[in-house]
Each structure stands twice: as C-alpha cells, then as structure tokens.
Amino acid sequence: MIKIETVTKADLLKVLDLMETFGMRYWLDGGWGVDVLLGKQTREHRDVDINFDARYTDALLRTLVSHGYEITTDWRPVRIELCHPELSYVDIHPFVINEDGTAKQADLEGGWYEFEADYFGSAVFEGRTIPCISAKGQKIFHTGYEFREVDKHDIRIIDYLLSAQSSD
C-alpha cells in the first residue's frame, strides 16, 4: 500500500463523515483537533486522531477496514492506527465513557488515564460543529512526552486559546 503522509481538510471531513454514521460519541483530538478549536488549519497533519466510545471498537474497525483502511499499529485497548491509500492515517483511541461525562482510557501498563467532563466539547469548523477535545483537555493531553516541532506549534495555539478563554 502506498502510504500518504498528509491529511487534507477534505480528507478530515471525509473521516468525520464516516464517524458520524455510527451514532456514537467521539471527539477529534491531536493536531487537527487544535486547528478545529482555532477555526482554521495552521499546519499539515499526518493523521486524524479520534477518541471514541470503546463499545464501538469492533464495529468501527470493521467499517474502517471495509472502507480501505489497513491496521498499521494495534495497541488495543490503548490505540489503533490505520492507514488508507488516499486518506492517510487515522489514529483511534477507545474511551470508556461514564454517565457523568467523565471518561477513561487504558494505558500501556494496564492502568487508566482519567479525564474530566470538561475535556470534551465541540467547535465550529468550515460551518460544521465538530465534537473535539477542549483546549483544557488538549493541554493535558500534550504532557508526558518530548515535544516535536508540530507539538510546540500546537501548544502555542492551545495556550492562546486558553488565555482567550480566561479573559472572557
């Protein structure tokens, strides 16, 4: 399979259209999630990061594979990365969603990451309301690893968004 390393805005919207067919809760995360919070694309993106209701893991994987995706990294139950010959990469992260809006995600050591309800929100991008990780959640999710240049870029935007929120 030829692997494309860039997800365009049109590709992102196609992936989100596919996610919408499930009727499940999901949130855009990662670099595209930051750009959606800002309301415009600010850099190139290698993948689309999606956090989703873990109860749909098997159905989501079957659908992605039937649409031409191929699993490239399988770290279940933490994350699964898939590649599509035209739409590039999608990195899916199963979340256990609690009734109070909080959630948790398995970690690689057999434990859990716990997430507050206000980490989950939405933003308008290209005239469309997209469920995404909030700026507060993005700030937390951008911890615990060494930053690449794209992460530093995203953090500057997250800090800008958080400072704009605090001045409101």
Place the predicted regions along the sequence by residue.
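Conserved catalytic core of two-metal-ion nucleotidyltransferases
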Residues: 69-103
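Anion (oxyanion) recognition and catalysis
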Residues: 20, 65, 124
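Helical scaffold of the NTase/Pol beta-like nucleotidyltransferase catalytic core
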Residues: 1-28, 156, 160-168
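Active-site nucleotide-donor binding segment shared across nucleotidyl transfer reactions
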Residues: 16-48, 53, 59, 134
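Catalytic cores of NTP-dependent nucleotidyl/adenyl transfer enzymes across multiple folds
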Residues: 105-168
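Short, solvent-exposed loop/turn segments at secondary-structure junctions
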Residues: 33-34, 97-98, 137-139
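Short, conserved charged micro-motifs
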Residues: 56-62, 103
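A short alpha/beta connector and helix-capping loop motif
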Residues: 61-69
